[in-house]
């Protein structure tokens, strides 16, 4: 389905149906590399063409740099070049982000996801300088990550325009949801624009977005691939039907939070990825039963 919008070269680097993959842990709370391989293979076998590691859903604040690098190397060995591996290199410390970006480049990441610096609330000029230093640290393509609900500040439109002029900044993960502001930016900047909030997946496609970086995709990778394909083939009715079918998963994510929902959903589907690390906690028994019911409604259990 042609949108008539500017071609987005970032798609070739960041894929179309991405999942912000959980980081699996053993019962003792250590990194579970074998489970990481299993999750990655499962997702890629079922239509996912980009895995985002060490992001929000990957519990990046509580995962060490060594663990992040170990997981990325293991996933690369497991899926090869069947999916793009995008590494979360954003922190609220520019120097640390640069070091992390360089480390991910050395172990074979295909691209970087760089979130807005959180907690410190820098100015827009500070954001430009922060992202620019990271972009200059490696040759890897970069996807900006705008999520003011967690970072405390938005990446404003003029800042996005400035950053889009940098040669390696090719994409945006939008978890801000300001579709009025974003619609012209998709055209003006040529950035590949990704839904970073599952309730808006179909909306972003309609506005010229390039795909998804999803949480509910853990439970429904095939359905997300079909949603994307149906839209691209012009079957809007089918895309809307799939989107509606997935709404119970969206509701569950809203109740439980992305990490807890995704890990519990995988466990219910037979893939044990362990509990989250504190301060995030697993669902209680009632919450788990409610999730089970939602997954059955969505046809994924």
UniProtKB/Swiss-Prot annotation:
Group of enzyme by EC: lyase
GO molecular function: 4-hydroxy-tetrahydrodipicolinate synthase activity
Localization of this protein: Cytoplasm
One GO BP annotation of this record: diaminopimelate biosynthetic process
Catalysed conversion reaction: L-aspartate 4-semialdehyde + pyruvate = (2S,4S)-4-hydroxy-2,3,4,5-tetrahydrodipicolinate + H2O + H(+)
Designated name of the protein: 4-hydroxy-tetrahydrodipicolinate synthase
Active site: 145 (proton donor/acceptor), 173 (schiff-base intermediate with substrate)
EC number annotated for this UniProt entry: 4.3.3.7
Keyword Mitochondrion: no
Cited Pfam families: DHDPS
Family matches, as SUPFAM superfamilies: Aldolase
Site residues by UniProt (Part of a proton relay during catalysis): 56, 119
Signal sequence coordinates: none
GO CC field: cytosol
InterPro entries, sorted: Aldolase_TIM (IPR013785), DapA (IPR005263), DapA-like (IPR002220), Schiff_base-form_aldolases_AS (IPR020625), Schiff_base-form_aldolases_CS (IPR020624)
Chain sites annotated for binding pyruvate: 57, 213
The protein's role, per its UniProt record: Catalyzes the condensation of (S)-aspartate-beta-semialdehyde [(S)-ASA] and pyruvate to 4-hydroxy-tetrahydrodipicolinate (HTPA).
Annotated pathway: Amino-acid biosynthesis; L-lysine biosynthesis via DAP pathway; (S)-tetrahydrodipicolinate from L-aspartate: step 3/4
Chief place where the protein resides: cytoplasm
Organism: Corynebacterium efficiens (strain DSM 44549 / YS-314 / AJ 12310 / JCM 11189 / NBRC 100395)
Record HAMAP family: DapA (MF_00418)
Similarity field: Belongs to the DapA family.
Sorted UniProt keywords: Amino-acid biosynthesis, Cytoplasm, Diaminopimelate biosynthesis, Lyase, Lysine biosynthesis, Schiff base
Subunit structure: Homotetramer; dimer of dimers.
């Amino acid at each position: 389905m042609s949108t008539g919008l500017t071609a987005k070269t970032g798609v070739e680097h960041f894929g179309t149906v991405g999942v912000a993959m959980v980081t699996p842990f053993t019962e003792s709370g250590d990194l579970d590399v074998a489970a990481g391989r299993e999750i990655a293979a499962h997702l890629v076998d079922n239509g996912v063409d980009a895995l985002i590691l060490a992001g929000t859903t990957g519990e990046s604040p509580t995962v060490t740099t060594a663990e992040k690098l170990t997981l990325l190397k293991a996933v690369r060995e497991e899926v090869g070049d069947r999916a793009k591996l995008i590494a979360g290199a954003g922190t609220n410390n520019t120097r640390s982000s640069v070091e992390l970006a360089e480390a991910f480049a050395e172990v074979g990441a295909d691209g970087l996801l760089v979130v807005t610096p959180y907690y410190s609330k820098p100015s827009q000029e500070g954001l430009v300088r922060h992202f620019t230093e990271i972009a200059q640290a490696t040759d890897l393509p970069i996807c900006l990550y705008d999520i003011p609900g967690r970072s405390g500040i938005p990446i404003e439109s003029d800042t996005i325009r400035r950053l889009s002029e940098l040669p390696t900044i090719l994409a945006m993960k939008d978890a801000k949801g300001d579709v009025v502001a974003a619609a012209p930016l998709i055209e003006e900047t040529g950035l590949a624009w990704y839904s970073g909030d599952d309730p808006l997946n179909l909306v972003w496609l309609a506005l010229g977005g390039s795909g998804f970086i999803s949480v509910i995709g853990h439970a429904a990778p095939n359905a997300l691939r079909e949603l994307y394909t149906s839209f691209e083939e012009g079957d809007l009715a089918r895309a809307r039907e799939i989107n509606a079918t997935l709404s119970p998963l969206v509701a569950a994510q809203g109740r439980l939070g992305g990490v807890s929902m995704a890990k519990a959903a995988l466990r219910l589907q037979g893939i044990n990825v362990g509990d989250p690390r504190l301060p995030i906690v697993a669902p209680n028994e009632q919450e788990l039963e409610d999730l089970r019911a939602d997954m059955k409604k969505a046809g994924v259990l």
